[in-house]
Regions:
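The feature captures the conserved acid-bearing segment of alpha/beta-hydrolase catalytic domains
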Residues: 200, 204-255
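Alpha/beta-hydrolase active-site loop
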Residues: 143-166
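C-terminal catalytic histidine-bearing segment of alpha/beta-hydrolase fold enzymes
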Residues: 251-302
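Conserved hydrolase catalytic core segment
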Residues: 191-203
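Short beta-strand element of the alpha/beta-hydrolase
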Residues: 91-102
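Cap/lid segment of the alpha/beta-hydrolase catalytic domain
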Residues: 107-109, 114-117, 126-151, 266-271
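N-terminal cap/lid segment of alpha/beta-hydrolase-fold proteins
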Residues: 32-91
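Gly/Ala-rich beta-loop-alpha elbow adjacent to hydrolase catalytic centers
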Residues: 178-186
């Protein structure tokens, strides 16, 4: 006995069969798009040096103003490390950090990776290469004074403006992370009465690891400083003294934590990074602070 099936019913049966077969096949997850985290060599243009209030007053009175010595101003070499977090890259704009090294140009590799893994781009700049005549790890003299902090802070502000102009970076979420001597310069880059007041863009917050607290702490944004107990290069006592001295009305909060390094004094008396600098305690402290400041992404890989 033959059965006549209408063409439209046959099409419907075939469609249902294909759908059921598809459900029985193993589900394939689309392959994740690989993230290129290779550092990119960049050159950061130095911003025009701001005119001080004194120079403006002299000019307004018609008095001669001596030229500014810009011989040590130069473009700043750097490396940009993109964030590792896929989501942070795909939502359009991600936070970024300007990283300032110690006076010998060193910056902990672990911290570049940690910041990347939390969805932040990292711009590591090299002020030493921009100003080779300034030997920052050595002491200056009356004949040849060292003004490294000022130059480094200005380099950091130039790097901030460079990042603000980059595609994919949120201009309102650029922080500064200083290490050792670089942390001292970073503090000067957020000083309310310093260079930063002359420019439109400001850092969102500051992190200083093993900071040399030689700069003013009258900050316009919150900061977290983490020192090591008995650190011979960057004594925590300097930071305590600065914090007490610069406790002025309107200053943003400065948090200062001192951590036991667990190292003998001989190992601390070097410019090499110490294992405690990227320990779970310090990583948690920093990433929670950055998250509170609106910086950290959703990734928790470190």
């Amino acid at each position: 006995m033959s059965v006549n099936i209408r063409p439209e019913r046959l099409v419907a049966v075939l469609a249902i069969s294909v759908a059921v077969a598809g459900l029985l096949l193993p589900f394939k997850v689309p392959a994740a798009t690989p993230v290129d985290t290779t550092p990119q060599a960049v050159t950061i243009p130095s911003l025009p040096y701001p005119q001080s209030g004194l120079r403006k007053r002299l000019a307004s009175m018609g008095k001669p103003v001596p030229p500014v010595d810009e011989s040590l101003q130069d473009d700043i070499p750097g490396q940009y490390f993109p964030p590792q977090n896929d989501d942070a890259k795909n939502i359009g704009q991600h936070p970024a950090v300007v990283a300032l090294p110690d006076c010998d140009g060193s910056f902990p590799d672990d911290w570049v990776r940690i910041l990347q893994s939390h969805g932040m781009g990292v711009l590591l700049i090299s002020p030493n290469e921009a100003h080779p005549s300034q030997a920052y790890c050595s002491e200056g003299s009356l004949e040849a004074p060292k003004h490294g902090l000022t130059y480094w802070a200005f380099d950091a502000i130039s790097a901030l403006h460079y990042l603000v102009g980059m595609d994919g970076i949120d201009p309102e979420r650029v922080a500064i992370f200083g290490y050792g001597y670089g942390a001292g310069a970073a503090q000067l880059a957020i000083y309310r009465k310093g260079h930063a007041k002359h420019f439109d863009h400001h850092f969102r917050t500051l992190v200083g690891l093993r900071p040399q607290c030689m700069s003013e702490m009258d900050n316009f944004v919150p900061s977290l400083l983490i020192g090591l107990k008995d650190d011979p290069f960057n004594p925590p006592a300097w930071c305590h003294w600065r914090m007490d001295r610069d406790l002025l009305p309107g200053r943003s909060n400065v948090s200062f934590e001192v951590i036991e390094s667990g190292e003998i004094i001989e190992k601390q008396a070097t410019r090499r990074t110490l294992s405690v600098e990227s320990s779970a305690v310090i990583v948690t402290m920093v990433t929670e602070f950055l998250s509170k400041m609106g910086m950290a992404g959703d990734s928790t890989r470190n």
